Amino acid sequence: MATRNEEILRKPDWLKIKLNTNDNYTGLKKMMREKNLHTVCEEAKCPNIHECWGARRTATFMILGAVCTRACRFCAVKTGLPNELDLNEPERVAESVELMNLKHVVITAVARDDLRDQGSNVYAETVRKVRERNPFTTIEILPSDMGGDYEALETLMASRPDILNHNIETVRRLTPRVRARATYDRTLQFLRRSKELQPDIPTKSSLMVGLGETMEEIYETMDDLRANDVDILTIGQYLQPSRKHLKVEKYYTPLEFGKMRKIAMEKGFKHCQAGPLVRSSYHADEQVNEAAKEKQRQGEEQLN
């Protein structure tokens, strides 16, 4: 009879990366602690943190606290009863973006189902503060589904991010097991309404694979996203954060990810990043529209 350890799939070589903890990375981590800020890069144990913080000048801040009101079975973020909102957080995030000299910033948040506005007002204020202090930094937001609250979504989109990112995470069949407090159709509705509110802002979603889905289900999910006018797709390998989380059912090869990307582009996505270590914010600075890219170029000119 197989033991628990034998049941866990062996991680393939292409998922083994060398961590480069340089002075830049160490300094940024120290600054985050001094300012009492959180990044999903750290909380979700992202394998790309060194590349993003160092070479690409991108980072993903996690606001509204460090405790999520949901307990999705794939996610490493702490769950439980959150603290009160920190109304000074928007200014601290904006200041940190400036000190880090970021080219592109992703602002995500824990789900705050305990709040009447789902945290949308502080979220929108964070976008505005970052924009005020960093006019050449492109901003991507990665919110929860806001409990399906349309007014909360309106508040978010009125802050005019450069990208709206909301993750489908997995295929329809697996959604109840993977993220019980969310629904597949509510995610699609959230993405569609975002585009209706601000048609010129690109929308984006991300899919984890390796949870037991079929290739046909992956392609059906692509079709559902395109039917709701989603522009950008990222696809990455699910990695089990701990023994308490869902186990990996399959490790996809780089060749299989290449095929997924090819199919996604054929289905009409403007951008698709697909690979074993791809995460929702991976190479996000490349995915903004032309107007936002011009803003990035102006910022580069000021640095030189």
Swiss-Prot record:
Cofactor binding, note field: Binds 2 [4Fe-4S] clusters per subunit. One cluster is coordinated with 3 cysteines and an exchangeable S-adenosyl-L-methionine.
Database matches in Gene3D superfamilies: Aldolase class I (3.20.20.70)
Protein's cellular compartments: Cytoplasm
Signal sequence range: none
Cofactor(s) the protein requires to work: [4Fe-4S] cluster
Residues involved in [4Fe-4S] cluster 2 binding: 68, 72, 75
Positions of region (Disordered): 282-304
Domain Radical SAM core: 54-270
Main location: cytoplasm
Gene Ontology cellular component list: cytoplasm
Positions contributing to [4Fe-4S] cluster 1 binding: 41, 46, 52, 281
Keywords assigned by UniProt, alphabetized: 4Fe-4S, Cytoplasm, Iron, Iron-sulfur, Metal-binding, S-adenosyl-L-methionine, Transferase
Pathway: Protein modification; protein lipoylation via endogenous pathway; protein N(6)-(lipoyl)lysine from octanoyl-[acyl-carrier-protein]
GO MF entry, a single one: lipoate synthase activity
Catalyzed chemical reaction(s): [[Fe-S] cluster scaffold protein carrying a second [4Fe-4S](2+) cluster] + N(6)-octanoyl-L-lysyl-[protein] + 2 oxidized [2Fe-2S]-[ferredoxin] + 2 S-adenosyl-L-methionine + 4 H(+) = [[Fe-S] cluster scaffold protein] + N(6)-[(R)-dihydrolipoyl]-L-lysyl-[protein] + 4 Fe(3+) + 2 hydrogen sulfide + 2 5'-deoxyadenosine + 2 L-methionine + 2 reduced [2Fe-2S]-[ferredoxin]
Pfam families in the record: LIAS_N (PF16881), Radical_SAM (PF04055)
Protein EC: 2.8.1.8
Family note: Belongs to the radical SAM superfamily. Lipoyl synthase family.
Protein name: Lipoyl synthase
